[in-house]
């Protein structure tokens, strides 16, 4: 490591730098297919951590089918925009949520984005949302192992683990 970069957080060559957010633990929640309860697990995990006094962010990265706001009854809320940052929607004093659903004029309209647009959205959700100081950031991902899962692992600091949600059917683990 060159002396000028020793001790400085940096991404391996060719990868974008990690987002500069104050979070101790990032936990991603993913599944091999849809409809297995991934968003329910994400919501319950975030709610349980918040109920135990932790500062928690819940990031809904299911860009094509965001439903965390609906599950929490906050689908009519919108994040405030202050200067160049968005304020996440607060469910409680220590549980904040950000989702593409807050930014769409109509959540029934499909979002058809390719890799670079998804990567840019994920970078914005990490860097341009005023998360404050978090103990946990729970990231609800879309089904599969596509761009969102790869991007969040590349961009988020302190990714501590993953919860893989499945059901006891053969097709759920493909």
Each model region followed by its residue ranges:
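Short glycine/serine/threonine-rich phosphate/pyrophosphate-binding segments
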Residues: 36-44, 66-69, 144-149, 172-174
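Amphipathic alpha-helical transducer elements in NTP-driven molecular machines
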Residues: 20, 65, 115-123, 146-149, ...
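Conserved catalytic-core segment of NTP-binding enzymes
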Residues: 131, 135-174
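Phosphate-binding loop that captures ATP/GTP phosphates
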Residues: 55-108, 112, 119-121, 126
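Walker A/P-loop phosphate-binding motif and the immediately C-terminal alpha-helix
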Residues: 25-63
